[in-house]
C-alpha cells in the first residue's frame, strides 16, 4: 500500500478542516518534530483565537478535564487514517518547553529535548492501550 497523504491535526484546525475528510490511505500526526506539542499549541491559541473559537475547538475534540493532549490523541485515533503517529511529548502531556525543533531558527534548544524513561508512567501506557483498543487499532 502506498501512503499518498499526510496530515497534521493542528494544521487541519487552522484550515477549517476535520478528520472526517481524511482518507484511509493517510498518515495523521497529532504533531511532528517541527511544530509545537499539542499542549503548547493549544495554550498558544489564547493569543490567536476568541474564547468562542476556543470553546468550539474544545467541543469538536470533546475535551474535558482529561487534558487537551488526550483529546487530540483520541480524536486522531478515531479518524479513518490507516496510521496515526503521536509524539511522545503529547503522551507525556508536555508543553512548548519540550518542543523538539523550531524550523528556520538556530537555537541551542533545537533537537535538545530528551525523555527520561521515568517520565512515561504506567497510567499513560494504559491510556494509550485503551484509546488504541477503543478505536479498533489494536
Please provide the spans of the model-predicted regions:
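Conserved phosphate-binding loops in nucleotide/dinucleotide-binding enzymes
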Residues: 28-30, 115
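Carbohydrate-interacting/catalytic domains
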Residues: 7-16, 22-23, 36-138
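Short, small-residue-biased leader/transition segments that mark boundaries at the very start
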Residues: 1-3
Amino acid at each position: 500500500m502506498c501512503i499518498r497523504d499526510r496530515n497534521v491535526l493542528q494544521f487541519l484546525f487552522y484550515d477549517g478542516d476535520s478528520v472526517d475528510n481524511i482518507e484511509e490511505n493517510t498518515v495523521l500526526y497529532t504533531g511532528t518534530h517541527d511544530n509545537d506539542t499539542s499542549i503548547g499549541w493549544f495554550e498558544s491559541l489564547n493569543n490567536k483565537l476568541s474564547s468562542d473559537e476556543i470553546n468550539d475547538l474544545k467541543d469538536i475534540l470533546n475535551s474535558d478535564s482529561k487534558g487537551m493532549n488526550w483529546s487530540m490523541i483520541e480524536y486522531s485515533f478515531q479518524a479513518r487514517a490507516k496510521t496515526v503517529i503521536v509524539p511522545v511529548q503529547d503522551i507525556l502531556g508536555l508543553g512548548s518547553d519540550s518542543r523538539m525543533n523550531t524550523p528556520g531558527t538556530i537555537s541551542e534548544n533545537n533537537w535538545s529535548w530528551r525523555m527520561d524513561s521515568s517520565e512515561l508512567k504506567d497510567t499513560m501506557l494504559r491510556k494509550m492501550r485503551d484509546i488504541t483498543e477503543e478505536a479498533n487499532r489494536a
